[in-house]
Regions:
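Mixed-charge (Asp/Glu-Lys/Arg
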Residues: 1-120
Length: 120
């Protein structure tokens, strides 16, 4: 069953809140490529940004990953997370290994991964 995109964004926001981040979401409408802003009390400004895609039938490719890198650069954000219910193309994964952006999504066993660490 496919997860509705807004519900998925809310689940992702709650996950980051439970793992110690202060979260801020955008109002409905154009989000500029960012679904959740992550903040740390000890760090001024936005510490990381999150883009969510509830795509089970599509793989996230290089284009949306590059776009998120562009937002990170334009907004001087040091870290990013791209979260999907589906998978990533090999080129998209390779691109994220070269920077501060992590691909997050389920592995073939249904476990969620953040970089090389699994979420249970």
């Amino acid at each position: 069953k496919e997860l509705e995109w807004k519900r998925f964004e809310k689940l992702v926001e709650r996950y980051f809140a439970r793992t110690g981040w202060e979260t801020r979401t955008n109002r409905p409408g154009a989000d500029g490529g960012v679904d959740v802003h992550l903040l740390r009390p000890e760090q001024p400004g936005v510490a990381a940004i999150v883009q969510c895609k509830a795509w089970q039938t599509y793989n996230v490719g290089v284009k949306p990953v590059r776009e998120l890198f562009g937002v990170m650069a334009a907004d001087c954000v040091p870290e990013g997370f791209f979260v999907t219910t589906g998978d990533y193309t090999g080129d998209a994964r390779t691109l994220t290994r070269q920077g501060r952006l992590r691909c997050v999504g389920p592995d073939k066993g249904g476990h969620w991964e953040v970089g090389k660490a699994r979420l249970r």
